[in-house]
Amino acid sequence: RFIIDRWSEEDIKGFLHLAYKKEVEERRSEIIEDEPTMTKIAKAATWLTGDYKPGLLLYGGVGNGKTTLAKAICKTIGILYDSAYSNERKGVCRISALEVAKCASDPESFTRLRNQEMLFIDDIGTEPASIKSWGNEISPVTELLYSRYDRQLFTIITSNLNDKELEERY
C-alpha cells in the first residue's frame, strides 16, 4: 500500500494544509481554519504516513470539505511524487462516480480504472445504482471498489450519503 515515508507526519500535515488552502482559494473563498477542518487535515496526514488500509472514505453533508480535502491529498501526492522532490512518478487519477458508471460500458476504460495505482472517486451515490452493459445488469462503482479493495489499491472516495445509505447501496 502507498505510504508517504520520506516526510514526517507533521510535514505532510503542513503540505496538506497549504494544498487545502489553495483549493479553497481557487474557488474564490476563504479557508475557515477551525478545529474540525484542521482535525480532518491532521487525520489525512496520519493516514498518508501510517500503515493503514489503502482506502479513505470521506463522507458527510454537502459543503463540509470532503472533495476539497481529497483534492488537497491528490495535489500533495502530485507535488511530492511528480516533481524534482522524487525520482518516483506518482499521481492520483480523479474521476466522478457518474463518469465511472459511463466508463463501465467500455471494458478497456473500466479495466484501466481498476488498475490505476491511485484513484480518487468523487461523489459516490450520485451515479445510477446499476446499469445495463452488454445485456447484463452491473453496478460499476461497487464492482470497481471491490476489485480495488481485493488488490489493496490506494483509493479515495467522497460521498454525501450517510452511514445507513452507504451500507444499503454498497
Write out the residue ranges for each language-model feature.
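A short, basic N-terminal segment
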Residues: 1-52
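Short loop/turn elements that form and flank the Walker-type P-loop nucleotide-binding site
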Residues: 51-52, 88, 113-115, 148-152
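Hydrophobic anchor at the beta1->P-loop junction of P-loop NTPases
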Residues: 56-58
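Conserved glycine(s) of the Walker
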Residues: 63-66
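Hydrophobic positions on the alpha1 helix immediately C-terminal to the Walker A/P-loop
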Residues: 69, 73
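AAA+/P-loop NTPase substrate/partner-engagement loops
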Residues: 75-119
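Walker B catalytic acidic pair
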Residues: 122-124
